Amino acid sequence: SEMCIRDSPWTRKTLENGLRPELAAKAGNALQKYAIENTRLGIPVFLAEEAPHGHMAIGTTVFPTGIGMSATWSPTLIEEVGKAIAKEIRSQGAHISYGPVLDLSRDPRWSRVEETFGEDPVLSGRLGAAMVTGLGSGDLSREHATIATLKHFLAYAVPEGGQNGNYASVGARDLHENFLPPFREAIEAGALSVMTSYNSIDGIP
């Protein structure tokens, strides 16, 4: 659903022709009604939204990027950000948040460094867990809770030559000591979804 409600040059949606929050909520409700009433099993659908530093949609709050939020060193503040994001996502009828980004940005040439919480696995893990908690820890029975999607599994931010999507040369020890712990901590906080990366690691896709 993100493609119809956010302002972006790729989708050619703007503040003038995109969906405002009220219309986005109506569109989400219409999709659910159709899925329930016009499909064989009548199963409601999950709607997902991009949320790297706020719900990426028209009429929502834009927070600092991940690298900016990490400069606060404040899990409490990041949890509050997560709560605000979850409320805006759920108020427009969606359930899944694409975020937080837990890539460890160790190569400044990589084009997505600003999405991350930086290079430190401990800080990334703490802030990632705080964001997941703020997003609602996947408990959709709560009024403003979403399912957090952790990005990008695994070792995505260290591509050869800094080129996005390129292969990563990372050994098993580095993976286990540095790249995996932030994901583990966020999963223990309640994340229910993980987005895979687009790279190969030591030649293994």
Predicted features and spans:
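Glycoside hydrolase catalytic-domain context in secreted enzymes
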Residues: 1-2, 6-205
